[in-house]
Amino acid sequence: PGGVCLLLLLLCQFMEDRSAQAGNCWLRQAKNGRCQVLYKTELSKEECCSTGRLSTSWTEEDVNDNTLFKWMIFNGGAPNCIPCKETCENVDCGPGKKCRMNKKNKPRCVCAPDCSNITWKGPVCGLDGKTYRNECALLKARCKEQPELEVQYQGKCKKTCRDVFCPGSSTCVVDQTNNAYCVTCNRICPEPTSSEQYLCGNDGVTYPSACHLRKATCLLGRSIGLAYEGKCIKAKSCEDIQCTGGKKCLWDFKVGRGRCSLCGELCPESKSEEPVCASDNATYASECAMKEAACSSGVLLEVKHSGSCNSISEDTEDEEEDEDQDYSFPISSILEW
């Protein structure tokens, strides 16, 4: 009798261990309540939930691979999904996030950056070229979807470097879309290893590499832009210039040079687009429509100012004043940062 009891005890222990191991660990529970994204099979709930992830879930069924495949592909996930975390207790969401119970009484990690040490309460311009109402709003955007987002300067994003105060040793530069950015100029450019690295700038100067063009742009404080790849040549027309990457040569009659530009862009049918006055003194429905006309004619067109050619804003006059003082070439040139 003693031997039988011992055998039964061992059998029960074996079944208990097997049931503890049988189960599947999943990385999330979907809105339909099913487990999705299989992490590992044959794990106990304790082992699965020890990862500490808020979204980790577990299913008890020890099923074969065919059933798992059907669940994931045809059924929207595994049924009888058990979330590892039912409350916010002992949930570590990481820096800048906090665990809160949502409307369905489920724990969720939400963005909650520490904004207590922020001294500047006004709007800021982010590295993405967008204006945020304050630095705390920018930190929330960084937490949600843009981990590399930072403040580049205080105040709203501007179209000119006037009144832009860049932090540290960075310098204000106007890019090809006429937006002001703070960049660092003191980079060391390596010597080119191949003649294929040469670039012709929109200023007619040959640069040894893209790094040299970026540095020259930075020191100048506004966009120089890339005309075409290779050394600058004395072209008489666009027929002398070979464009790469699906670009088309547009001729700039003002300076007698060609420039390779991207064409074929479809203009969106949006009523929010602002009309622009182009360098041919014609008004276009949008900047995209102007580029479309330029690609069609083969003649380079630049934005003189926003709005129709019959109206000139004060900001435009300021920008034109800056252009005469600093640089005689167009500021809306293409700059490949």
UniProtKB/Swiss-Prot annotation:
Keywords annotated in UniProt: Disulfide bond, Glycoprotein, Repeat, Secreted, Signal
User: What are the cysteine partners in each disulfide bond?
Assistant: C25-C48, C35-C81, C49-C84, C88-C99, C93-C109, C111-C143, C115-C136, C125-C157, C161-C172, C166-C182, C185-C218, C189-C211, C200-C232, C238-C249, C243-C260, C263-C295, C267-C288, C277-C309
Query: Bias regions of kind Acidic residues — which residues?
Result: 314-326
Tell me the leader sequence span.
1-22
- Superkingdom of the source species: Eukaryota
- Give the matching InterPro entries: Fol_N, Follistatin/Osteonectin_EGF, Kazal_dom, Kazal_dom_sf, Prot_Inhib_GrowthFact_Antg, TB_dom, TB_dom_sf
The entry describes its oligomerization and partners as: Monomer.
Any idea what this protein is called? Follistatin
